Amino acid sequence: MTSGAIADAPARRSAVSGVPQRLSAALAAVRAHVVRLRGPYGVAALTFGVYLLLSIRRYQHYQVPSWDLGIFDQAIRNLAAFHAPVSLIKGVGFNVFGDHFHPVIALLVPVYWLAPTAMSLLVVQDLLVAASAFVVTKAARTVVGGYSGVALGLSYAFSWGLQEAVVAQFHEVAFALPLLAASLTALVAGRWLTCALWALPLVLVKEDLGLTVVVIGLLVVLRSRGRQAALGGALAAWGAAWFVVAVKVVLPAVNGQGVWDYSRQVPWGTLSDPVTVAERLVQPTEKLHTLAYILGITGFLALRSPLVLAVLPTLAWRFLSDTPAYWGRLWHYSAVLMPIMFLALIDAIRAVRARPVSSRPSLLRAYAAVAAPVCATVAVMLTINGLPVRELVRPSFYRPDARNTAAERVLALIPAGSSVESDAGLVTYLTDRDDVYWMGRTGNPAPEYLLVDGRNGGWPTPPSDVVAYAEQLHPGTTYVKIFDTDGYVLVERVTG
């Protein structure tokens, strides 16, 4: 061996011996990453499992709170067949893109190619909630550490706003949850471009979320400088532009009446008076109760973060509206507020911890340290006090009752391909096989069958004489009753 070869040998041995060292370091990094993600994945899996069980059992037990699931089922079924997203429940030939600006629902078309059923929408919604729980938990662990981060993630996942949204069944705002969580997580971390990229699609989820994007853009302006501030301004302009385009151009053009329907729910003429506006925002007191719940789930600590401003557009349209259903805690209207509030909480904790110890008020520092268990306690207490997840520990929740059997029997009497007019009770269970109309809407053609749920049919108020009601709705027809059990009444058209 030459002297040069001998001299090169140690270098080769060093290079070879460095390979396992680098491999070991890489494996250690991967292992550390897996450990960091184990908590978020666990929270997401638990969230999906719990909500999927809740969704399936409620659906199997015919616990349907409204017609919305049926509307989305009809619309997406038509999209999947390359037709306009028409829902007969909303009206003959009614295009749902004239109801709300939510083109994001087109993403569900491949789902319907694989599994064309309303249950698929519930599964997708549960997945979206779980995905947002993953993002929030990951953000929380970054700021407050392992166990506290998981506690905050679980508090978010089972917050009252998300529980109510799940039992309200599918709505397009479910898509906003992971988008908001990811955008605000990036905002907290100072990743301005990432924040903007996740916020951009929110304008395609629902028209009012364009205003939420405006606030997110302004928050970027507030927190950044130079080009990043310009990025925030552009994001705010994007949100404002899409809001205007949606409510002034798209919705009136697609809506059969040439208007944005929901603009009628706000008395715009009274909003020029600041006193009137202030009164409408706080009266009746149900609005203040809702606000207390929204802030209370974070132990009110979220108020120390400017991110909390992102709730204002949603609260404004809800509280200024004349529609009482918007003021309270039920339904899905508070779902989009949950990721905002919990990311604001995480941001507030981060800000408190980032300040020098000498400048932190001792009480605030101590409170921020226990924010995770406080939020977890609030979530548990609210659930015990009557939130939907509590149903899962009741044995009766898993047992079918006489009403379930009656529902199955009455649905079996309606042949596939029939035209049916129904209240909200069983409408969702017919949309996959029949032409289904809502009986509270004028202008429907005379259906072959009219179905009423006399106990849980929602609105309109169930008629005492269904045959007479059907013949009054559709003059010149004759109906006969063919089923009347446990509150379900089915009549069939025989003439007309």
Residue ranges and their predicted role:
Residues Y41-A45, A236-A240, V352-L387:
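Signature aromatic-anchored transmembrane alpha helix within multi-pass, membrane-resident enzymes
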Residues A165-V173:
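Short acidic/glycine- and proline-prone juxtamembrane loop motifs at membrane-interface regions
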